[in-house]
């Protein structure tokens, strides 16, 4: 693991709180090397997502991970707001 722990994006607490308010189960995994930020369970589905602020770019590791899963037909979302996250899990339209 890197000498420097990965920090959570500043909007992460707000997004996680909104997800939990609609009944989602959220686990933080952003401190694990080469992982995305959260795993979210909601209404029988599991989402593995990266949380980013505004136009903050993905890191090289994040981009590589998302592309690797895309090659096998799995889309890993990048959520930049509470609305994106709630829409992403199907809690709102």
What positions do the PLM features span?
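Catalytic phosphate/metal-binding cores of nucleic-acid and nucleotide-processing enzymes, i.e., regions
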Residues: 1-93
């Amino acid at each position: 693991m890197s000498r420097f722990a990965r920090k959570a994006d500043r909007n992460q607490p707000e997004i996680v709180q909104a997800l939990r308010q609609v009944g989602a189960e959220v686990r933080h995994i952003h401190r694990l090397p080469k992982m995305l930020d959260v795993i979210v369970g909601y209404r029988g589905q599991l989402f593995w997502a990266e949380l980013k602020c505004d136009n903050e770019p993905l890191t090289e590791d994040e981009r590589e991970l998302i592309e690797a899963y895309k090659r096998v037909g799995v889309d890993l979302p990048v959520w930049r707001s509470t609305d994106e996250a709630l829409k992403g899990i199907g809690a709102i339209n």
